């Protein structure tokens, strides 16, 4: 946009030119927006001749309209000091003056040529007016106006005045309150190699004219000097170039590896086709046929039944886990609604582990059959190129046999790290809900997988022949066990990581799964993590037996034991506080006795001194000191009393809470007993709830009104009398049922799987939570 300058905007007297203590009164820096982020502004400018640099000037301005420091440095031609050393001194002076300032500093430079000469740290924000003006496409008339204005002012006389006036003009015409000061990188500066010398010699602050070749050589020589001597305070340009080259090489290596991986399956398929053609042309002899691998073993009907049993067991286990999650949601949030979709605030990262029955020819794995394991490790570049494969094969098997393979691509191993043994640990130790959610999800995956394997086995039985050797027991078959995973040792020689799940194969020749992490039933890694046992057997029979031996009641009992341990800890804490209160009360009593004795002695001494020596100043001074000591002790005793009172109040609150919990438990027991034992018949009518009482009374009144309408005799007191009669008909007394067999006299009620047996809002855990909140306060 075009704009004109008024003479009233920039009028400087001789006094203002020389004094530089303040800026023009009409100029105001913005105290809002991005300018308010900075505490000081440094304006740096260089003046040039056709062949060299003439001078350097910089000023430091405070946002309170004050000039803190001004410097004008001339490059004298008489001295033999080289240009690079002179520039090093100037940069050192600017850095020293910036170090004295507090807060963030904004460095302004009116020309793009000045910025390569500055060697400032990365913490300083450098801003170039000329680049921003060109990006905003400001018309050239404005530059011409700047040139004419500063040319007429004869800026060579006073350099301080030029910088201040420049800053005022630029902030008035270009900078707004919401203007963003972009960070500047010296590498992005592109100084043109060819340029004209015309119009550059007027000491113009703003120029869009080409730079002379001599000045280009000076600037480039100074940058080379900084690089060679490693004097750059910013990140060196050579290091950035090296990093870019390394990244380019890494990308090329990754592309080559991917191409090799794509070529490998094609080569395998070609080799297989050649072998098939050779077998057709040259049939194998009797010896070769005996050595070759036999067809896969036929699966017996007992094994199919075992698989069906296993699927049923997994489904039942999933249901029980859903119930436990439902109960845990009640315990943690009794007031909230039960929503199975809520897992938690944090979701840990996961590793994809493949452990499926796949043919060797099928290289594409579906995500539905993948088992995800928890892992909270950041991806590293070292493991991106590694490919982990662990195979359990038999040399006597055919290509159609099911082989236990675990493969992972580059993207799947990107999340692995050296700390791979920590997979069994849940990231948030207290997040039991998420742990149960993960177990349920893994169970669903296993159930799907078992069902698929059942279908494939049944199909294979129909296709295979009956006359098959029984010597093929070494073929691997997957027998999954849920809820736990382990990772084998890392092969340091090949720089590859072997990732396997804890699903044991049937073959006894497999030695890779010997170091599995096993957790027995009822044990816990942490206080709040519930685990389920692993199956480490290598035979199918032992596998199925161990799976069937898991009892759901034991799992429930483990959860109750964990809750009981938490409550026991709270009781121990309560006893500890009681002991502390008793000790403090005893100490308080002893201190009070000492205080009384000291106070009585001092009082007697004061009386004696007043009778004997009324005018003795020394005794009065001693008495004053003793009174001050007494007052100090009184204050200490009062503070201790207040502490004891606070602790007693907390004790009373705890006792009241315990009584409320007991009463609520008793009420729950009585209510449950009444609801379970409702007697029917004329003698013992059913219990009528409060909601039904109003409806029954209304129905009775309506029936009475109908009778009265039929008889045409309306009695206003008739309905009231009938209500009174019904209220007088009380329930006959009956003996309470013997609840000794129903309720077990223990601290905790046995948990049923039905929804009615779930804990209510006012339970032990809710009171326990309130108890913990009182301690936090």
From Swiss-Prot:
Alphabetized UniProt keyword annotations: Coiled coil
TM regions (residue ranges): none
Protein's recorded name: Putative uncharacterized protein DDB_G0289041
Native source organism of the sequence: Dictyostelium discoideum (Social amoeba)
Ranges annotated as biased composition (Polar residues): 712-729
Gene Ontology CC terms, in alphabetical order: nucleus
Region (Disordered): 263-303, 357-400, 454-516, 656-741
Superkingdom to which the source organism belongs: Eukaryota
Keyword Transferase recorded: no
